[in-house]
C-alpha cells in the first residue's frame, strides 16, 4: 500500500524488490525493521530476505512460488484462523529480542509532527475533540502488560500461505507490544465476523492458557480499545500520505467512521 514492488528474475531465481517512497523514510525506522525482519526469518515466520538496507529501506525478498496472500474469506474460516493462531503463539512466545517498542501513541505523535496542515485532523469531523480526548485516555493501556514481540501490521496482504505453511511478511511496524494488538489488527483488517473474532480470541487464549474467564472478558474490552486506537492512527497516517500527493480514495473516511463506531462501544 505504501511501497513499489517489482518482481525480478536473477539467474533463474525470482525475487521481489521493494522500493519505498520518500515519505516512508520519515515514517519507518528501517534499522528496527531490518533487525526484526532477520529474527523473524530465523524463527521460520518470515520469508528469506537477502537484502534490507537500513538507510534506504530497499528490500530484496525471495519470491515464494505457489503462494498466495490470505483473503478476508479465508480469514473468516476456523481452519485458517487456527493456523494464524499457531504463528501468533510462536511469535509472541519467541525468544526474540526486539530493540524497539511499538506504541500507537508515539507513532501518532510522530505522524502528527509530520502533518503540515494540523487542521486536516481536527476539522475532519465535528466530533474530533471527543475522539482525540478518548484516544489519549488509553495511553497507559499497556502499562501493566508484559510486552512481547509483535508484528503490528497483520493485514491479510501480510499473511502469505505456501502449501500448508504460513508466513508473516513486511515487518515495518514490528516491535514489542501487547499480543492482543496483533489479534485486534486481524479482526479489524480482515473484517472478521463476530463468530470468527470470538473463535480467534478463544483459540489463542486456549493455546496460550493465559486467560481465565474474568481475564477473557477484559481481553474483549482491550481488543476494542486497540481497534479504536488503530483506526485513529491509520486515519492520521493517511492524511500525512495525502499531503504528499498519494491518493487513498475514501480510505481515511472509512478509518474515521470505524473509529467513531468503536468509540460508541468502548467501556
From Swiss-Prot:
GO CC field: cytoplasm
GO biological process annotation, one example: phosphatidylethanolamine biosynthetic process
Gene Ontology MF terms in the entry: ethanolamine kinase activity
Domain of life assignment: Bacteria
Transmembrane segments: none
Pfam families per UniProt: Choline_kinase
Protein function: Mediates phase variation of the LPS epitopes. Phase variation of H.influenza LPS epitopes expressed by LicA is determined by a translational switch.
Family membership noted in the UniProt record: Belongs to the peptidase S49 family.
Misc. remarks from the entry: Lipopolysaccharide (LPS) is a glycolipid that is a necessary component and antigenic determinant of the outer membrane and has been shown to be an important factor in the host-parasite interaction in a number of Gram-negative species. H.influenzae is able to display an extensive repertoire of different surface configurations through variability of its LPS oligosaccharide.
PANTHER family (UniProt xref): CELL CYCLE REGULATOR CCRZ (PTHR40086:SF1), PHOSPHOTRANSFERASE YTMP-RELATED (PTHR40086)
Protein name: Protein LicA
Underlying gene: licA
Amino acid at each position: 500500500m505504501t511501497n513499489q514492488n517489482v518482481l525480478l528474475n536473477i539467474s533463474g531465481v525470482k525475487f521481489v524488490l521493494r522500493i519505498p517512497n520518500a515519505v516512508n523514510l520519515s515514517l519507518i525506522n528501517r534499522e528496527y525493521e531490518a533487525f526484526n525482519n532477520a529474527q523473524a526469518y530465523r524463527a521460520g515466520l518470515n520469508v528469506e530476505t537477502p537484502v534490507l538496507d537500513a538507510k534506504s529501506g530497499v528490500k530484496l525478498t525471495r519470491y515464494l512460488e505457489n503462494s498466495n496472500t490470505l483473503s478476508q474469506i479465508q480469514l473468516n474460516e476456523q481452519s485458517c484462523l487456527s493456523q494464524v493462531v499457531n504463528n501468533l503463539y510462536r511469535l509472541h512466545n519467541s525468544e526474540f529480542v526486539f530493540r524497539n517498542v511499538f506504541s500507537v501513541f508515539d507513532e501518532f505523535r510522530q505522524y502528527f509532527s509530520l502533518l503540515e496542515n494540523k487542521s486536516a485532523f481536527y476539522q475532519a469531523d465535528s466530533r474530533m475533540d471527543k475522539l482525540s480526548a478518548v484516544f489519549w485516555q488509553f495511553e497507559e493501556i499497556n502499562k501493566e502488560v508484559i510486552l512481547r514481540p509483535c508484528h503490528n501490521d497483520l493485514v491479510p496482504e501480510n499473511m502469505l500461505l505456501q502449501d500448508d505453511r504460513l508466513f508473516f511478511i513486511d515487518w515495518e511496524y514490528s516491535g514489542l507490544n501487547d499480543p492482543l494488538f496483533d489479534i485486534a489488527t486481524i479482526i479489524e483488517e480482515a473484517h472478521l465476523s463476530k463468530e470468527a473474532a470470538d473463535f480467534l480470541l478463544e483459540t489463542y487464549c486456549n493455546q496460550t492458557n493465559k486467560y481465565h474467564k474474568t481475564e477473557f472478558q477484559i481481553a474483549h474490552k482491550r481488543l476494542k480499545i486497540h481497534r479504536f486506537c488503530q483506526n485513529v492512527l491509520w486515519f492520521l497516517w493517511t492524511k500525512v500520505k495525502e499531503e504528499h500527493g498519494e491518493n487513498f480514495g475514501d480510505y481515511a473516511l472509512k478509518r474515521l467512521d470505524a473509529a467513531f463506531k468503536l468509540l460508541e462501544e468502548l467501556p
